[in-house]
Curated annotation (Swiss-Prot):
Gene this chain is encoded by: moaA
Catalytic activity entry: GTP + AH2 + S-adenosyl-L-methionine = (8S)-3',8-cyclo-7,8-dihydroguanosine 5'-triphosphate + 5'-deoxyadenosine + L-methionine + A + H(+)
Transmembrane regions listed in the UniProt entry: none
Organism encoding this protein: Clostridium botulinum (strain Hall / ATCC 3502 / NCTC 13319 / Type A)
Name listed for the protein in its UniProt record: GTP 3',8-cyclase
Domain of life: Bacteria
Oligomer and partners: Monomer and homodimer.
Amino acid sequence: MLDKHGRKINYLRVSVTDRCNLRCVYCMPPEGIVKKEHDNIMRYEEIFKVVKSASLLGVNKIRFTGGEPLILKDIDKLIYNTSKINSIKDIAMTTNAILLEDMVEELKKAGLKRVNISLDSLKEDRFKSITRGGDINKVFKSIEKSLSIGMKPIKINTVIMKGINDDEIDDFMNLTKKYPISVRFIELMPIGEGRKLYKDGYISSEEIISKHSDLIPVETEKSSTALLYKFKESKENIGFISPMSCKFCSGCNRVRLTSEGTLKPCLHSEKEVNLKNYVGNNQALLSKINETIYNKPLEHHMIEEKESKSKKMMYQIGG
């Protein structure tokens, strides 16, 4: 369907949990989070009802996120049920891949088509520091397994932070020359824990691109969040997601469902609607989703204000 600004909204990002098996420095506090009561989070049946209703309004792309979606039991069943909705054409997942190696075959059989893997360092000790305990070898094995079963293109999402991992930019770029792997560099955002790092850690996409004159621009869809480039010898592309220096609101095609059941029309807006109040009434649910999508804000103002208006942390919304 179209929002009131004429944008086609066909993409729903679903955070199935706010819990995670890592504690990335820009996402979660070091002590972790307080576990929510079961009644305060969306059950699979409720998530499926929202996905089904959204599909009736023109949503045909679903991405499951977290927290970390793979820590939830039976996530493959939710993917399978979603894949049986005829109008859903693409099901993807964003994961830290710690648990992916042993699950990726079943996930693919269930209907998962693509994975984005959050990976902010290729160095074992640094990865452990950024994630506060993660084992990078599990991620590497998951990538190898995913490639071996034809789960591609695989995209790696990398949040670049000055003084923390910006010396690895070339190493990440070179992955696209060796493997059928896309890399997405994401600007650090002043949201949640990222606020603490933003002043000293922010690097613009433009600064990175300007230092690599051999990058070749690649044509992108209007709704893409990334500006795409590649090297002459690249197997896949290199993307730059630039919410701070070059926002992509004019072509935004997505809304977000949080693990608590709130529908956020914009990642950086404080406006959201609690759909848990409507999942027992199909018509009311459909109407509320329709209303929320239609009233999606024209744009965020994070560039001007240097801070997200969202009151939620990234692990609650889904990155």
